[in-house]
Amino acid sequence: MGLCDWQCLSRGHWSRDVAYAITAVLTPDNRRQWERDLLVRYLERFAALTGRRLDFNESFRHYREQMVHALLMCTITLCHSPLLPNMQPEETTLTMIERITTAMADLETI
């Protein structure tokens, strides 16, 4: 599994990064097979490091909601200002967008 990281800093809900990492990077088949286990693993590590145990169903809802943000972040790299250089190969961006939108359809995000 690889991850495209833009090296930017922002403040937001933990599920934003998790949704991006899982939906943009994994093939749809792998995501379908692993996403719940990956989220459980993330929540276990979160609890171990913070002492806060998060509810899985609520966390899964947050994960689904943040797929929209993942789509936005990928779309920006495809439709950036002409004043900026290409951020990544168009093929990479289109693959990530296809994966994210497939996840959104699978999980009825919209």
Report residues per predicted region:
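Pre-DFG segment of protein kinase catalytic domains
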Residues: 2-5
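Active-site activation/catalytic loop segments of kinase-like enzymes and analogous catalytic loops
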Residues: 8-50, 67-88
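Glycine-centered secondary-structure boundary/capping sites
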Residues: 50-51, 108
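Short, charged, surface-exposed loops that flank catalytic or proteolytic processing sites
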Residues: 52, 56
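Regulatory N- and C-terminal appendages and interdomain linkers associated
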Residues: 57-110
